[in-house]
Design a protein with these regions (language model features):
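Single conserved hydrophobic/aromatic residue that forms the stacking wall/gate
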Residues: 194-197, 201-204
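N-terminal leader/targeting and accessory segments in enzymes
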Residues: 1-92, 96
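Phosphate-binding loop of NTP-binding sites
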Residues: 59-62, 71-196
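Active-site flanking residues adjacent to catalytic metal/cofactor-binding acidic residues
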Residues: 8, 31, 136, 162, ...
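Charged, amphipathic alpha-helical interaction segments
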Residues: 22-23, 102, 200-201
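Compositionally biased, low-complexity repeat tracts
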Residues: 50-51, 135, 199
Length: 204
């Protein structure tokens, strides 16, 4: 378990990761190179989360046991390199959530059709009477959804249908869903991926 977690990126994924951190009993700090949306910043502060915006303090950023990176932050970003140099484990929000859910995971990825397939599978499972959750790139962050589910009287969901983008998968270390659906692979987001491993390699 972790005592202190740094979350890089204060978007939907970052807020969700912060909520899960607090639910696990860890303290956390959210840092973003840009401005944090006022409403989100207020919610985080009310939860007792330390929020930094407009840049990153290297010493404070690396004063942690784990760095959880939002998918919008490239792996070559200086804060990520600082963490690596300090010997701090760096994982993505998707991986962080997967490590702390007791539910089974069905991950859906591919270039096109992810959201439709994820939504359809979730609908079929819920209609069939299963306690299924839906999260990831489809809307609610996986970490935030897991954090909320853990607070229910009945506990975590039995199964999660997770839409996973190539950017989210790029940050995984030992993410092993119970079921993985690879829909298709076509060239996309080349302006961002041309210096990175291909989506196929990331999926492997």
């Amino acid at each position: 378990m972790y005592d202190r977690v740094t979350i890089l990126g204060a978007g939907e994924s970052g807020e969700g990761a912060a909520k899960l951190c607090l639910g696990l009993g860890a303290s956390c700090r959210v840092t973003d190179a840009g401005a944090v949306k006022a409403e989100r910043k207020q919610r985080l502060l009310e939860l007792g989360v330390d929020v930094e915006e407009g840049g990153h303090d290297r010493e404070a950023l690396t004063a942690c046991d784990l760095l959880v990176k939002s998918p919008g932050v490239p792996p070559t970003a200086p804060p990520v390199q600082w963490a690596h140099e300090a010997g701090i484990e760096v994982i993505g929000e998707l991986e962080f959530a997967a490590r702390h859910t007791t539910g089974r995971i069905a991950a859906v990825t591919g270039t096109n059709g992810k959201t439709t397939t994820t939504g359809l599978l979730h609908h079929l499972l819920v209609t069939g009477g299963l306690d299924a959750g839906c999260a990831g790139n489809i809307g609610d962050s996986f970490a935030g959804a897991v954090a909320e589910a853990r607070q229910r009287p009945e506990g975590d969901r039995d199964i999660w249908i997770v839409e996973a983008s190539s950017f989210q998968l790029e940050d995984t270390v030992d993410f092993r869903p119970d079921v993985a659906l690879l829909l298709n692979l076509t060239p996309d987001h080349l302006c961002l991926l041309y210096t990175s491993p291909s989506p196929r390699d990331i999926g492997e």
